[in-house]
Amino acid sequence: MGFGETFKALSDPARRDILSLLREGRMSAGEIGAHFDMTGATISYHLKILKKAGLVFETRDKH
């Protein structure tokens, strides 16, 4: 993870909005998607870029 990946991740307004939303606490991809007019695939794409840049991390809950 370098500066290039971080700046790329932060260059998109939707990704900045996702980060702002996540400041409130942990959320699932579905919960994040409920706040935006985007498909689940688009939310996943943005989250992948944010994860690659080290700006968010993923945890999985056992059911």
Map each language-model feature to its residues:
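Amphipathic repeat-derived elements
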Residues: G40-T42, L47, V56
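Hydrophobic alpha-helical segments, especially transmembrane helices
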Residues: R16-D17, L47-I49
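Alpha-helical residues within the helix-turn-helix
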Residues: G33-A34, Y45, K51-K52
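Beta-hairpin "wing" of winged helix-turn-helix
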Residues: K51-D61
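N-terminal helix-turn-helix DNA-binding core of bacterial DNA-binding proteins
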Residues: G2-T42, D61-H63
